[in-house]
């Protein structure tokens, strides 16, 4: 039960994040993103918590719509997909000591690391043209964690769309 609750908390994704939060964005530098005006969703790896999935979907749709890219299932330019995951990580400290009178205690600490990957896939070519990855240590209660999701997504899309490609 503890693991299930912890996993749900971690998948409340990047919730109350520590300073260890990292956002990485990659894109095809040959692509002109100004032509993308519509998208539809394709299935990815959903969070365990349905409410988290709804928050993620709304946050991503909001970031795209403020940039002039709107949902259109009939004729999308882009497919949007996200992958949410969490894993427990361990940190081991201590160990051998030079003083043989002391056993050299070992301390093991664990924390949850959450990852969110958002891919934008060119619908015509069926290939990823933009990817943002956010990773962070997740802590705090579920309500606070859920409340932080939109700001994490906003940071992921901060520089979207990328600048138009230069001359060859």
Language-model segments: residues:
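Residues at beta-strand starts and edge strands
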Residues: 4-5, 37, 76, 114
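Bacterial N-terminal signal peptides
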Residues: 4-15
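Residue-level detector of anion-binding/catalytic polar loops
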Residues: 70
